[in-house]
Amino acid sequence: MSRPLRPTSSSPWDCSGGVFDWDVALRKLDELNARVEDPTLWDRPSEAQAVSRERANLAAKVEAVQSIERDLKDALEYAELAEMESDEDSLNDARAQLKSLKERAGRAELEALLSGEADGNDCYVEINSGAGGTESCDWAGILLRMYTRWANAHGMTTELIEETDGDQAGIKSATLLVKGANAYGWLKTEAGVHRLVRISPYDSSARRHTSFASAWVYPVVDDNIEIEINPSDVRTDTYRASGAGGQHINKTDSAVRLTHIPTGIAVACQAGRSQHQNREEAWKMLRARLYEAELQKREAAQQALEDQKTDIGWGHQIRSYVLQPYQMVKDLRTNVETSDTQGVLDGDLDAFMAASLAQRVGHTRDGGEAS
């Protein structure tokens, strides 16, 4: 395999010395290419899959940078030619190309910052309603829809693993499995409490209500990562799955809840048709939860997740969504805000995620209007 060319020193995408060091990335890609081409690697299937996945992820980042540089060179040549010929239409086309390239470069830069141990993994998004009763249950349902739409817009797939309906509307809780490139790396920035202010559709007096719901995000654990769980530390409960009914409604105790007694971490699954399927998925979820807890300790990125969960209310907010008396979504960590509330609720979260990700890796940016 040929070694990719290094961008020129005059390239506007010079990452040397940053989180994505170009020379280090090329050396690492050479090493991974050599390992993939070593036939003895495939005697160890789990390791081979992990190496192949790491190589594909890094190769995609390198190609993204090189593609931007190639297109930038072409756009600049086109602009120079248009300027020499005083062709205003072509100049406008060149400006549009350069604007698009700037956006691509920004996205590629952020993708390069997804260098955490589990950033490339699929993930679970666990949503829970908080203070506010029916209003909060409805709000939790809106968040579930928001993240589903975000994932679908980015070519990811989703699967509803568990859902508990609210008494009157919305959901009390739900767990969404999101599968796609860097799913955990992006969605981990959404972990925290989300606050909604609106005129309640459930209040006959049309009063303004404040509601809370939380989103907690855990990486799906790769098969080659060993998470040791003593079966005697896990309590298993079964119960009847809830749902909308119909011919496929489950009339047996097929839903499964696992509780890890030492940590108090609990997971539940009711998506499968059988108790066996739900038990298997619940164990995957429990491994993911315990892995996330270990990552937090190792990276010292934030206090233990279960400590944060004690109060789904004012104390741990990351974002505020105001629909009345004015319309504004504001991230309380980065100060990024937008008045396009409907767009955000329809899954347009990239500006918030990008700012939070940049802040996490030490590339703090000024807060501003979300585009």
UniProtKB/Swiss-Prot annotation:
Methylated by PrmC. Methylation increases the termination efficiency of RF2. Keywords: Cytoplasm, Methylation, Protein biosynthesis. The modification N5-methylglutamine is found at Q247. It is found in: Cytoplasm. InterPro entries: PCRF, Pep_chain_release_fac_I, Pep_chain_release_fac_I_sf, PrfB. GO terms for cellular component: cytoplasm. SMART domains: PCRF (SM00937). GO terms for molecular function: translation release factor activity, codon specific. The keyword Cytoplasm applies. Disulfide bonds: none annotated. It comes from the Bacteria. Belongs to the prokaryotic/mitochondrial release factor family. Peptide chain release factor 2 directs the termination of translation in response to the peptide chain termination codons UGA and UAA. This is Peptide chain release factor 2.
